[in-house]
Swiss-Prot record:
Residues 366-385, 428-449 have a biased composition (Polar residues). One of its GO terms (cellular component) is Golgi apparatus. InterPro entries: AH/BAR_dom_sf (IPR027267), AH_dom (IPR010504), Islet_autoAg_Ica1/Ica1-like (IPR024114), Islet_autoAg_Ica1_C (IPR006723). One of its GO terms (molecular function) is protein domain specific binding. It comes from Homo sapiens (Human). GO terms for biological process: regulation of transport; spermatid development. Residues 365-393, 427-449 are annotated as: Disordered. PROSITE patterns: AH (PS50870). This is Islet cell autoantigen 1-like protein. Residues 44-247 form the AH domain.
Length: 482
């Protein structure tokens, strides 16, 4: 019974009808949750309602994001105002210690920064008001609209469930059966009641969403107008102060800061002290480069002398057998790499160097032969007429070239080997006289190798002045015996 004493419609419904109504409503909820396709005509009838729901969800999300942005903005304003105020105080403190024009500029700029920091904090007042209004709007207007939408969704689910129920009953409808017609009329009445409730809530939702959007626009326009007015006033005052400082400092001379030591009144000019320092630093750098290059050159010459001594000692150990096998060595050398004009162009400078030092090498070998009693001293003394031509000829090839260069012209190497073999044979005879008519065929003593080696070492005499010239061409045992 209701308040007027009339029976309610629910009291006349049986338990079976309530169960059936609950069943179809649950089936509609399941269809919506699983995302199954519904009747396209039924969905098209709710297109306007769905558009209003999208607007509501957009308003709800934007209000939440706006609250977060306002909080971050207030925090950033406080931080930048604090940093600006500290910079202004620092400039004012430094201006008290400086009585020059720079001190005046720093004092004026520091005062402007402190004033700007205080005025920037004034922006927090309209922002706080905006935040409060947005929070109130979200808590009341948006929440009330959300409650209405939830009731509307329940009514729509119930209405669509009743439609499914009526569709199922209509498939079993038989006009000749009075009982089935009565059942269809009851289901049809349920559909009409649910549709009326749904239409009423649908209208309420559409009206509240429209009112929600309009109220949000009014709120934001009022709050943001206050914020905009405050922001424009802040920038106008700050720009005015900065322009006044700029106009006051127009007559001041600019300063060039050099290593943060002192201020200069004449821009684009470097002081004499700095020039001297730069010149001194440049000279020191160049001197260091020269010293390093000399050390590297001396180190390379020492390494070359050591390698050459090792190669010469190996040649002395092998002796004549080395020359006996020289023809085979010449045959094994690649002919393509030994022939041509490239070798003569690359190593032509050695002939000039060795020929220029031939006279000095002959004097040095004579002193060595006199000091150590070489048996071939008499032989070399008997040949003064040969002069510079044999020495020049012998200085064109050094035994160490086989180790340093690793390749030679095949023909020239074979000629040299044949000459050496003939000379070794002549050195073992009883000092036979050499005819003067054939100056090209020379008899060489074993000390000619030492003479050639001394000429080779004279090339490095300037690079390594500390080496012992008496030790050239002799082993350690011979020096100890001497």
């Amino acid at each position: 019974m209701d308040s007027f004493g009339q029976p309610r419609p629910e009291d006349n419904q049986s338990v079976v009808r309530r169960m059936q109504k609950k069943y179809w409503k649950t089936k509609q909820v399941f269809i919506k949750a699983t995302g199954k396709k519904e009747d396209e005509h039924l969905v098209a009838s709710d297109a306007e309602l769905d558009a209003k729901l999208e607007v509501f969800h957009s308003v709800q999300e934007t209000c939440t994001e706006l609250l977060k942005i306002i909080e971050k903005y207030q925090l950033r304003l406080n931080v930048i105002s604090e940093e600006e105020n500290e910079l202004g105080l620092f400039l004012k403190f430094q201006a008290e210690r400086d009585a020059t024009q720079a001190g005046k500029m720093m004092d004026a700029t520091g005062k402007a920064l402190c004033s700007s920091a205080k005025q920037r904090l004034a922006l927090c007042t309209p922002l706080s008001r905006l935040k409060q209004e947005v929070a109130t709007f979200s808590q009341r207007a948006v929440s009330d609209t959300l409650m209405t939408i939830n009731r509307m969704e329940q009514a729509r689910t119930e209405y669509r469930g009743a439609l499914l129920w009526m569709k199922d009953v209509s498939q079993e409808l038989d006009p000749d059966t009075l009982k089935q017609m009565e059942k269809f009329r009851k289901v049809q009445m349920q559909v009409r009641n649910s549709k009326a409730s749904f239409d009423k809530l649908k209208m309420d939702v559409c009206q509240k969403v429209d009112l929600l959007g309009a109220s949000r626009c009014n709120m934001l326009s009022h709050s943001l107008t206050t914020y905009q007015r405050t922001l424009l006033g802040f920038w106008k005052k700050t720009a005015r102060m900065m322009s006044q400082i700029h106009e006051a400092c127009i007559g001041f001379h600019p300063y060039d800061f050099v290593a943060l030591k002192q201020l200069q009144d004449t821009p684009s000019k470097i002081s004499e002290d700095n020039k001297d320092e730069q010149i001194g630093g440049f000279l020191t750098e160049q001197l260091n480069k020269l010293v390093l290059s000399d050390e590297e050159a001396s180190f390379e010459s020492e390494q070359a002398n050591k390698d050459h001594n090792e190669k010469h000692s190996q040649m002395r150990e092998f002796g004549a057998p080395q020359f006996s096998n020289s023809e085979n060595v010449a045959k094994d050398l690649p002919v393509d790499s030994l022939e041509g004009e490239d070798f003569e162009k690359e190593f032509s400078f050695l002939n000039n160097l060795l020929s220029s030092g031939s006279s000095s090498t002959s004097e040095f070998t004579q002193e060595c032969q006199t000091a150590f009693g070489s048996p071939s001293a008499s032989l070399t003394s008997q040949e003064p007429s040969m002069g510079s031509e044999p020495l020049a000829h012998s200085s064109r090839f050094l035994p160490s070239q086989l180790f340093d260069l690793g390749f030679h012209v095949a023909g020239a190497f074979n000629n040299w080997v044949s000459q050496e073999e003939s000379e070794l044979c002549l050195s073992h005879t009883d000092n036979q006289p050499v005819p003067s008519q054939s100056p090209k065929k020379l008899t060489r003593s074993p000390n000619n190798g030492n003479q050639d080696m001394s000429a080779w070492f004279n090339l490095f005499a300037d690079l390594d002045p500390l080496s012992n010239p008496d030790a050239i061409g002799h082993s350690d045992d011979e020096l100890l015996n001497a």
